[in-house]
């Protein structure tokens, strides 16, 4: 009996230790920008993914499957991010994607001179559900949702709020499919929390990971995982190819 107890302890200890970590992944959407790859809606015209963008999203999904990801996927409400997340999810994810407006793109950057505002030039709730039926829209989410004239500092604040909320009110690993501009806010915020992530170009479907100690909410490791799955011929920054 003692041997059985010892055996169980030896098995459960590493499992318990592993459970004390959780990883937040942030991915940019796939390649977009070709005027031929656009979709017109009631209040806006949205970029859809270019052929390489679709391949990038598929590569992202295949990699997330290899990681054994079993957490929750959040996605920005833009068409290009919804499309990226939906394509990637086919490889590894069976639950609904959760819409998260706090990870939407930054529109004003440092040059914003007017007060931040909300514009109707965005997808409606009905349009999102019609085009992406696997997306869950939180009941508290307000429409319209798209911000205009937002400074980087305000974007940093909403990302900080999002990370705090997810750390406090969710469990398990997280994947957030968002945008190149807002990923800069993510990096700045994560560096405040213990990472030392370099400022660099955020390629289409880049994937950055930040692992937290669940007990302290401190970052214990971080990585750019893009090169683990992205072929060299698929490195793009929208219309710029490398």
Residue ranges and their predicted role:
Residues 21-100, 152:
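Active-site-proximal alpha-helix that buttresses catalytic centers in soluble enzyme cores
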């Amino acid at each position: 009996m003692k041997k059985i107890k010892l055996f169980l302890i030896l098995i459960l200890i590493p499992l318990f230790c592993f459970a004390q970590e959780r990883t937040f992944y942030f991915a940019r959407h796939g390649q977009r920008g070709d005027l031929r790859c656009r979709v017109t809606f009631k209040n806006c015209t949205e970029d859809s993914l270019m052929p390489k963008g679709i391949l990038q999203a598929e590569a992202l999904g295949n990699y997330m499957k290899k990681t054994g990801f079993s957490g929750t996927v959040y996605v920005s409400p833009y068409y290009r991010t919804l499309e990226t997340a939906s394509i990637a999810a086919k490889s590894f994810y069976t639950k609904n994607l959760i819409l998260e407006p706090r990870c939407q793109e930054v529109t004003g950057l440092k040059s914003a001179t007017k007060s931040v505002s909300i514009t109707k030039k965005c997808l409606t709730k009905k349009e999102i559900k019609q085009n992406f039926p696997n997306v869950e829209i939180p009941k508290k989410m307000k429409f319209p949702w798209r911000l205009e004239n937002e400074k980087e500092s305000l974007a940093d604040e909403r990302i900080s709020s999002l990370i705090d909320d997810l750390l406090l009110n969710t469990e398990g690993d997280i994947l957030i499919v968002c945008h190149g501009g807002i990923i800069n806010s993510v990096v700045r915020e994560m560096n405040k929390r213990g990472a030392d992530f370099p400022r660099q170009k955020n390629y289409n479907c880049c994937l950055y990971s930040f692992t937290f100690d669940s007990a302290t909410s401190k970052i214990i490791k971080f990585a750019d995982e893009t090169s683990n799955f992205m072929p060299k011929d698929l490195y793009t920054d929208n219309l710029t190819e490398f």
